[in-house]
């Protein structure tokens, strides 16, 4: 089987039959045993692959059973990876399976461990873990098949170091945060009310930890937000004084409700000039709602319905009673869980009551569950399609024809559901894949940092004096040379664990356009242990040929004209990705069709003369799917 180092654009590709034969003898790693992971594991075993290692940190939840077909009700709370391997083994007993109930970021899953695999498949729903696997595969020079789905949409991306874009070549949109001022005082969207109910109201009643889960952003609070935070602290003190009365009688609930939905709303409405350009909030009456709630008939039985105000009141009262009983019988704080009916009822009812107060659209409990639990709707058919495409792309990788590799997108289009595009070359400005890897074999744990800096970096690799070395933290730079005479062992650099050091610095022999020492791309040094007989009397041996380290490229600065084109292109991408519009490409024009109106309601929009999207515009387009 050709290794990744042998793959090139000039290599004569294998036939499909030869590639399939290679695939059957491959050793692969599957990261994630969820919706896509279950489908992928089934495909791998039915394809007859030689050996599969599967890793997942999660346990099986009741909500997984409708789409993760390897699991049954009896498996709830058991490790996903272990159960998936055990269940799937019946598909093909000849395949060697090894499962890990573990975090892929653990030290034991280092670069050397990744190198044992011919292919890695990512089936994750976690951005941080995806980036970690992406980096490990780049360092190990192992092809990665990245995949993701959301609803009816999905994508498959092939990542090969030095040949294609990596996962981080196109920036991903960060998770949204909401200013505390908006959440506390001026909500305007249903999500604002959901965040308030989940991250403020619920913790104040049932948790001793007064910090939110990070959704309410007060780190960079301005003066107005600082006042809001102070007001929040005052109200928190008042609310804490009422916590002891929760669950004792309806009197306790009345005090809580009156404070949150009557007194606080009246106080907020009296803020000067706050409601000049928006409708003021309207407080709720406890006695009026109590009377109407008696007529409500189990509104929580149907989570698809939108409750009226009286029904939300009834659900909130009952959920607080249930949660109060649980809180008294448990020493631990209660926390929100999307699959915990009691906590979900509380958040849904509180969010809808607050939405009614501010004249905001109210939602069903099902919709609020998606928001509060950050749930991306999962569809089993989408997972199955994407898993099948992962296998076809994996076989293409083993064929060795890099020119035929495609990134594939599953999308709702008028004429087709699959859209393919050729893989792009790596982004030269990407901070993740723009590096050079050097393997350094060490036979003596007493080798000092001075040997690395003076002998290897400066003498052999021609770094200037401006060089820095980092492990988990900075261990050397020109202004911090205290560690030069310390050994690798003293500094926690363990060759047995394949420690990765990062070197940042300038070249002593190359100059930039201004005649200054030019900055190089990061050098990553993988420190491994080797036998002393192979080092010719030195405490180390350079095992790879990283003698040429390219210069770091700087992104070009955009002129005002370029910025306007970029803005137009990003708007074009937003039009493309909108669920309410369909974009039909016709040479230099786009016809934008509003899918909610007549098919004749079209806009004709000329493209910029250069119809290739700039890197930033392209990034935004891809980010909409890559964050799945």
UniProtKB/Swiss-Prot annotation:
GO terms for molecular function: ATP binding; ATP hydrolysis activity; metal ion binding; SUMO activating enzyme activity; SUMO conjugating enzyme activity. GO terms for cellular component: cytoplasm; nucleus; SUMO activating enzyme complex. The modification Phosphoserine is found at residues 559, 563. ATP binds at residues 32-59, 64-67, 80, 125-130. Keywords: ATP-binding, Ligase, Metal-binding, Nucleotide-binding, Phosphoprotein, Ubl conjugation pathway, Zinc. Pathway: Protein modification; protein sumoylation. Zn(2+) binds at residues 166, 169, 430, 433. CDD domains: Uba2_SUMO. It holds the Pfam family ThiF. GO terms for biological process: protein sumoylation. Residues 597-628 are annotated as: Disordered. The keyword Nucleotide-binding applies. The dimeric enzyme acts as a SUMO/pmt3 E1 ligase. It mediates ATP-dependent activation of pmt3 and formation of a thioester with a conserved cysteine residue on aos1. Heterodimer of uba2 and aos1. The complex binds pmt3. PANTHER family: SUMO-ACTIVATING ENZYME SUBUNIT 2 (PTHR10953:SF5), UBIQUITIN-ACTIVATING ENZYME E1 (PTHR10953). Belongs to the ubiquitin-activating E1 family. This is Ubiquitin-activating enzyme E1-like. It comes from Schizosaccharomyces pombe (strain 972 / ATCC 24843) (Fission yeast). The lineage of its organism: Eukaryota, Fungi, Dikarya, Ascomycota, Taphrinomycotina.
């Amino acid at each position: 089987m050709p290794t990744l180092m042998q793959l090139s654009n000039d290599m004569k590709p294998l036939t499909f039959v030869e590639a399939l034969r290679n695939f059957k003898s491959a050793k692969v790693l599957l990261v994630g045993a969820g919706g896509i992971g279950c489908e992928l594991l089934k495909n791998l075993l039915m394809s007859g692959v030689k050996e599969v290692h599967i890793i997942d940190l999660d346990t099986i939840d009741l909500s997984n059973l409708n789409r993760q077909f390897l699991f049954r009700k009896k498996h709830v709370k058991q490790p996903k990876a272990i159960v998936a391997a055990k269940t799937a083994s019946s598909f093909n007993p000849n395949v060697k399976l090894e499962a890990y109930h573990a975090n892929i970021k653990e030290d034991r899953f280092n670069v050397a461990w990744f190198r044992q695999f011919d292919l890695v498949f990512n089936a994750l729903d976690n951005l941080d873990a995806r980036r970690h696997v992406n980096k490990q595969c780049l360092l190990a020079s192992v092809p990665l098949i990245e995949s993701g789905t959301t609803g009816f949409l999905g994508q498959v991306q092939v990542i090969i170091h030095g040949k294609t874009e990596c996962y981080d070549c196109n920036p991903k949109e960060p998770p949204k945060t909401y200013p505390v001022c908006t959440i506390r005082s001026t909500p305007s969207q249903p999500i604002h009310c959901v965040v308030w109910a989940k991250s403020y109201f619920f913790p104040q009643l049932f948790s001793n930890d007064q910090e939110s889960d990070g959704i309410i952003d007060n780190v960079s609070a301005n003066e107005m937000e600082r006042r809001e935070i102070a007001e929040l602290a005052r109200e928190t003190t008042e609310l804490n004084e009422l916590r002891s009365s929760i669950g004792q009688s309806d009197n306790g609930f009345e005090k809580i409700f009156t404070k949150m939905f009557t007194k606080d709303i009246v106080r907020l409405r009296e803020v000067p000039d706050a409601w000049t350009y928006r409708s003021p909030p309207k407080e709720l009456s406890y006695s009026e709602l109590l009377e109407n709630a008696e007529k409500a008939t189990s509104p929580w039985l149907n989570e698809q319905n939108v409750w009226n105000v009286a029904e939300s009141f009834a659900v909130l009262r009952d959920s607080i009673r249930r949660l109060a009983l649980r809180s008294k019988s448990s020493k631990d704080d209660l926390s929100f869980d999307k699959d915990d009916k009691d906590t979900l009822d509380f958040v849904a009812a509180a969010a809808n009551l607050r939405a009614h107060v501010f004249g905001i659209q109210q939602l069903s409990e099902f919709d609020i569950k998606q928001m509060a639990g950050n749930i991306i709707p999962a569809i089993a058919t989408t997972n199955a399609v994407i898993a099948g495409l992962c296998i076809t792309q994996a076989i293409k990788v083993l064929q060795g024809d890099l020119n035929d590799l495609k990134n594939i997108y599953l999308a709702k289009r008028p004429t087709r559901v699959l859209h393919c595009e050729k893989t792009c070359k790596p982004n030269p400005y990407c901070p993740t894949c723009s590096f050079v890897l050097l393997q350094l074999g060490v036979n003596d744990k007493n080798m000092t940092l001075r040997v690395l800096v003076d002998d290897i970096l400066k003498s052999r690799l021609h770094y200037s004096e401006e060089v820095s070395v980092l492990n988990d933290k900075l261990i050397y730079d020109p202004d911090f040379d205290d560690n030069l005479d310390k050994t690798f062992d003293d500094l926690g650099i363990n060759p047995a664990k394949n420690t990765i050091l990062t070197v940042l610095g300038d070249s002593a022999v190359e100059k930039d356009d201004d005649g200054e020492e030019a900055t190089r791309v990061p050098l990553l040094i993988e420190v491994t242990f080797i036998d002393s007989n192979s080092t010719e009397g030195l405490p180390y041996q350079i095992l790879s040929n990283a003698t040429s380290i390219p210069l770091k490229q700087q992104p070009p600065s955009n002129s005002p004209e370029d910025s306007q084109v970029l803005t137009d292109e990003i708007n074009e991408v937003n039009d493309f990705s909108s669920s309410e519009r369909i974009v039909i490409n016709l040479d230099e024009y786009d016809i934008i069709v509003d899918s909610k109106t007549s098919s004749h309601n079209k806009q004709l929009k000329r493209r910029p003369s250069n119809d290739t999207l700039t890197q930033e515009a392209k990034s935004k387009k891809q980010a909409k799917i890559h964050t799945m």
